[in-house]
């Protein structure tokens, strides 16, 4: 496989309503993903935004479906179930949670999430140990490193 193909994000448009993911700026971390059909995410509920796209991420990465900050701040919309493995080739649906008290209308062509390509360690060796090396933090979790 050539270097250029292994670093490619291959996108399949599954209908005439599907759109290729785009970046909002040249240095944006994520690619905006678009809804291919209208829909409603009910108040305090959840639903799936249809995209009519499939994609294969570059070698050594996985796709993380992340929220769009504007939807989160203005409408209380968050994403869920956001891991797309390299070997998944089906349609990518976007799980959306509506944390607001108003139904959220999705229109065809709306940007509903962003795709972030993250590097992964493939085939990490799992080693069972009796104990872990002590660290300054130790077992402290959830807010243990400070107040703010």
Swiss-Prot record:
InterPro entries the UniProt entry points to: dUTPase, dUTPase-like, dUTPase-like_sf, dUTPase_trimeric
Keywords, comma-separated and alphabetical: Hydrolase, Magnesium, Metal-binding, Nucleotide metabolism
Cofactor(s) demanded: Mg(2+)
Residues given in the record as dUMP binding sites: 69, 82, 85, 88, 137, 142-143
Biological processes annotated in GO: dUMP biosynthetic process; dUTP catabolic process
Metabolic or biological pathway, per its Swiss-Prot or TrEMBL entry: Pyrimidine metabolism; dUMP biosynthesis; dUMP from dCTP (dUTP route): step 2/2
Function, as annotated: Involved in nucleotide metabolism via production of dUMP, the immediate precursor of thymidine nucleotides, and decreases the intracellular concentration of dUTP so that uracil cannot be incorporated into DNA.
Protein name as catalogued: Deoxyuridine 5'-triphosphate nucleotidohydrolase
Organism: Kluyveromyces lactis (strain ATCC 8585 / CBS 2359 / DSM 70799 / NBRC 1267 / NRRL Y-1140 / WM37) (Yeast)
């Amino acid at each position: 496989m050539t270097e250029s193909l292994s670093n490619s994000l291959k996108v399949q448009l599954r209908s005439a309503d599907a759109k290729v993911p785009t970046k909002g700026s040249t240095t944006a971390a994520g690619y905006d993903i678009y809804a291919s059909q209208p829909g409603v995410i009910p108040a305090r509920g959840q639903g799936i935004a249809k995209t009519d796209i499939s994609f294969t991420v570059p070698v050594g990465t996985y796709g993380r479906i992340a929220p769009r900050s504007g939807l989160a701040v203005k409408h209380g919309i968050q994403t869920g179930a956001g891991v797309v493995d390299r070997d998944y080739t089906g349609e990518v649906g976007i799980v959306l949670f509506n944390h607001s008290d108003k139904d959220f209308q999705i229109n065809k062509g709306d940007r509903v999430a962003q795709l972030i390509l993250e590097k992964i360690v493939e085939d990490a060796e799992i080693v069972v140990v009796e104990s872990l090396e002590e660290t300054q933090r130790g077992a402290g979790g959830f807010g243990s490193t400070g107040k703010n």
